[in-house]
Amino acid sequence: MGTKWTEEQKQAITTRGSNLLVAAAAGSGKTAVLVERIINLITDEENPVDIDRLLVVTFTNAAASEMRERIAEALIAILDQNPEDKRLANQLTLLNKATITTIHSFCLEVVRNNFFLLDLDPNFRIGDDTETLLLQLEASEELFEEMYAKEDKDKEGFLTLVESYGGTKDDQDLQDILLRLYGFVRSLPWPEKWLKDVINTFRVEDNFKFETSKWAEVILDSLKVEISGILNTMLVAVDKLKNEAGLEGYFHAFQREAYEIEQLLQYDNWNEFKNHIQAIEFERLPNAGKDANKNVKEEVSNIRKKVKDKIKEIKEKFFSDSVEEIKDEIKALYPIMEALADLILLFDKKYKEKKREKGIIDFNDIEHFALQILTEIDEEGAVNPSEVALHYREKFEEIFVDEYQDSNLIQEEILSIIARENPPNRFMVGDVKQSIYRFRQANPYIFFEKYNSYSLDTGEKNQKILLYKNFRSRIEVIEAINYIFKKIMSKNIGEVNYTEEEKLNYGAEYEIPPEDSVTGGAVELHLIEKQKVEEEVEEKEEEKNEEKDFEEEEEDLIDDIQVEARVVAERIKQLFSQNFMVYDKNIKSYRVVDYRDIVVLLRATDRWAPVFLEELTQAGIPAFADTGTGYFDTTEIKTIISLLQVIDNPMQDIPLLAVLRSPIFSFTEEELIDLRLEDMEKTIYEAIKKASQREDELGEKAKNFLDTLKKWQEKAVYMPVDEFLWYLYKDTGYYSYVAAMPQGVQRQANLRILFERAKQYEETSFKGLFNFINFINRLKVSSGDMGSAKIVGENENVVRIMSIHKSKGLEFPVVIVAGLGKQFNTKDLYQKILYHHFLGLGPEFVDFRRRISYPSIVKEAIKYKIKLEGLSEEMRVLYVALTRAKEKLILVGSARDIKKNVRKWANAAILQEKVSEYDILNGKSYMDWIGAAVIRHKDLEPLREFAGVSLSEEEDASKWEVKLWNKKDVLLEKEKNDKVDVVERLRSLDLDAHYSEFYKEVERRLNYVYPYEKACYLPAKLSVTEVKRILNAEVVDEDTTSIFEREVLKTPIFLEKKKGLTAAEKGIAMHLVMQKLDLDKDLSLEGIKEQIKDMVDREILTEEQAKEVNIHKIEGFFKTSLGERMLSSKNVKREVPFHIKLSSREIYKDLPEEYENEFIQVQGIIDCFFEEEDGLVLIDYKTDYVQEGKVEEIKERYKVQIELYSKALENITGKKVKEKYIYLFFNGNILEY
């Protein structure tokens, strides 16, 4: 029985004589339609087409192979019915040489068949990414050296580029800009023409009108989105004022101001918009009545103030300069942009020479060479098909393009030039909602242009057909996807209006499941609350952890990922425990879910996938993660790279500590602390040299390290890097060592890959260890991660963990999309020079002589456009993720404060059917979008109730189930599960009597209680604050609060990004200033103010931090007798870290005597101490507010902490601490101990 095609599918299969654009939604059977159309052409009784007369272009090699297989299967099926049909049998033979391929492979065929037209060596090969990156680095180094050596006007322009964009220390930033821009330009069909046209946009003539430029148009669009957000916020305030007694005057004033703001949305002209916004004034509000609600008055007044500030900011940022001044700014950018374009062209020439010498081409060359072969440029600059292109036009009866939404401009140019014009013969199929390869320069506007211009009418030369019936997913999945995207996807963000025409229509046929079975069900939303903000503030304030290092931040992130992974693992186990069933088309029946039916999708897999893999595996769930990343994060590679860095320069503390701690030298943690205490002012390397003079075991280890390092440094001078690297593997024994580690085979393979990279490096003109380390660092950034070896096959019965991008084109019965709270990556917006295929170059305006820089108005326009396109892509990525699900969709995400987030989502959904573009633009994660879209749904009432949000309920066919998780509870639950009684498990087994004695022995051993069990639970390390908490457990912390009161009034959503500093951050700023002040300079109010300004200039403080520092209180300290004594001392130390060893019984008083020799490392930071003739004076600063009459209680509370500081200080210095003080900034009190 043949396939039942819908009318739209039949139309796509049978229509002839037109260019056809098939807009095919997820799960609409587009591949089946494409294959059927090919079969239909081959078997057409009147005008049959041989398979080798068709060009079928797919996005990946895998897709090409699948297409070829499907065509073969279809042909064989027809041959079974018509075994005598020789022509059909011949098609199977022709299929092997049919052009069913990727665009790159097709272009490569064009180049190989016509190499003589390019003066190209026929034996050329394609260089891999590493090889071509090395050549690019080599070419850029040589080019820069040549430019520095020049003595003409080109050098002047180049030096201006270096001064403006080169960076503070060297020209590395400019090299990065050059390589990044070159990569972008090479993705365009005509790079040189694009550069020339772009540079000419800066060559403004006297008649240039900025107000009608494309840049002004984009900025106006962005401002209208901003204004709409401001307007919505004002309307919320207006709504709150309705029927408020005593605030009638406020109500009318707010209405009037909201109306003035609303009028801005009607202007499409720069000058009209400018005139209106400059005319907006916020007059003094009338007095409120005596019966006015003070809370409402305060809330709306605060909203109005924020709106005023925002309008003022827009005026100053965009409309403080006249259009003439803007024109002068653009004109001033012309010479430097021209110099940049010239540099790109010179680099292109040099890079081509390098490739020619090596006999290689890169992937971009393939497409450009093909375009060069297929086109001829006439005298007027028009592009015409060459003879080769005309040959292909004659050869191919029809050109098929799959995944058309992912085409880029050069690919479109190539396919257009070989396509026929009369009759048209292009068949393009794709879904613009699934265009997710912008980072590869895929351009969805190519699809849009045709989608908007092609007709739905049959018989037209250019026709479009819409396939929006989804044959993949259950109705619950489809309804939920439609509900989300009708709320958030628009023409501006997502670049598609998610209308009735675009939405998914249910087309799958799922049989009725067995009675009492668990199938399908509501879409699940799992929200995990991470550690609350208040807890974080308390910890930061008390522990003064203002210099939280990178490793700690990494640990926090890993913790958050672990929690999500554990929630996912728990849900997967529940699916199996409840015998969740899926429909299997192969057996035409329901069956219990398998692991292979489940996929976990992540936006980024580099840090996330390894954690998910480990957690699922520990939970007994077989899993597979083909991340393609993680190479540089593996222990063995990090260790060896650290070792190379140390051999090159041992003065680097972090790599040196990594090497010392590694199995290569095996220093213990205690020994490293001992080393640090040798001399707190010197580097670790200098401390090792000092320690090598000792006669103890540490001295021996230090001497061995220095001798070994010297030996390696001598060999590194004359040995090639690859040989030296292999020598290190063998001399350290590390290559053999990793083989004995878990996944040892893979680890050795990773080390061999590094060796291969070293061999490639040695083939260039670069030499030496220093340059190799730089190359590896550039490889991390420029080429991404290299990926580590695979061990488990993805075809096994495992849960797959993969990126959303890799899942495209696939489908799974159960889809779990995790990491939805992860913030969007916006780093592209902060480059010094932005670029856009339509808007050109957007540079920072730099006056290096005056040392000032700011974003040019051109950059502001491009920045907004890139942000818009980036978020549109993120929305399409989310769409791809959700549409992978066939039967069950589970969404998982974390948030710092769920109640706060729910209130934010409610504000975004409160005034309109669709979430506003402003709120979408200001969403920080997928969770923000999903939350705002679904928060009004009737099924989310429990979540609204939890957050105390009152919102009108919305009816919708979609079904939702919300589950809240707490990070702490998830971690505790995991620990509890890990401690399940093994003996109880043994008891549940049906053991033969034969094994009873053996069983008893097992039980005895498993029930053995270690006599020093408490020692197993003692921490190895505690902070001073933690010790204080343990020893002061009976003290109730209610007498101190922060000086810096946190704002409790609700802030409008559009201003949430400007929250101001938290209480902890303000205290941190005070400590930082006290640490960095130059005590030899003027410490008057003006002097302190000047030093703080200098700290901002040197980026020690941010401007926001500087504003929060109370210079009067700092001056007040230095006017005290204690402050004056400190200034008189010749030896003042500030922010001194320390470690001391305490007996566990000093901290845990209830431990018995046998624990006397169990030690705990205590660590902390001493704010300040200074030396006088008869000893040391210790000072600890506090920024707490102390309630009246509670000073003595505060003094008592911090007694333990001060004693520990004193003890540590005496251990470190060997000198007596004669006096100990706490200084309270709030009231200037000095507490002496």
Curated annotation (Swiss-Prot):
Quote the catalytic activity from the record. Answer: Couples ATP hydrolysis with the unwinding of duplex DNA by translocating in the 3'-5' direction; ATP + H2O = ADP + phosphate + H(+)
Record's Pfam families?
PDDEXK_1 (PF12705), UvrD-helicase (PF00580), UvrD_C (PF13361)
Where do the UvrD-like helicase C-terminal domain residues begin and end? Answer: 518-809
For biological process, the GO terms are: double-strand break repair via homologous recombination
Question: What cofactors are annotated for this protein?
Answer: Mg(2+)
Q: Which GO terms describe its molecular function?
A: 3'-5' DNA helicase activity; 3'-5' exonuclease activity; ATP binding; ATP hydrolysis activity; double-stranded DNA binding
Where is the stretch described as Disordered? 533-555
> Which Gene3D superfamilies does the UniProt record give?
3.90.320.10, P-loop containing nucleotide triphosphate hydrolases (3.40.50.300)
Binding residues for ATP: A24, A25, A26, G27, S28, G29, K30, T31
Q: Where is the UvrD-like helicase ATP-binding domain?
A: 3-474
Superkingdom assignment: Bacteria
Q: List cellular component terms (GO).
A: cytosol; DNA helicase complex
- Record flagged with keyword Transferase: no
Q: Which residues form a coiled coil?
A: none
Q: Which family does it belong to?
A: Belongs to the helicase family. AddA subfamily.
- Kindly give the PANTHER family that the UniProt entry links to this protein: ATP-DEPENDENT HELICASE_NUCLEASE SUBUNIT A (PTHR11070:SF48), UVRD / RECB / PCRA DNA HELICASE FAMILY MEMBER (PTHR11070)
Relate the assembly described in the record: Heterodimer of AddA and AddB/RexB.
Job of this protein? The heterodimer acts as both an ATP-dependent DNA helicase and an ATP-dependent, dual-direction single-stranded exonuclease. Recognizes the chi site generating a DNA molecule suitable for the initiation of homologous recombination. The AddA nuclease domain is required for chi fragment generation; this subunit has the helicase and 3' -> 5' nuclease activities.
Q: What is this protein called?
A: ATP-dependent helicase/nuclease subunit A
| Source organism (scientific name) | Thermoanaerobacter pseudethanolicus (strain ATCC 33223 / 39E) (Clostridium thermohydrosulfuricum)
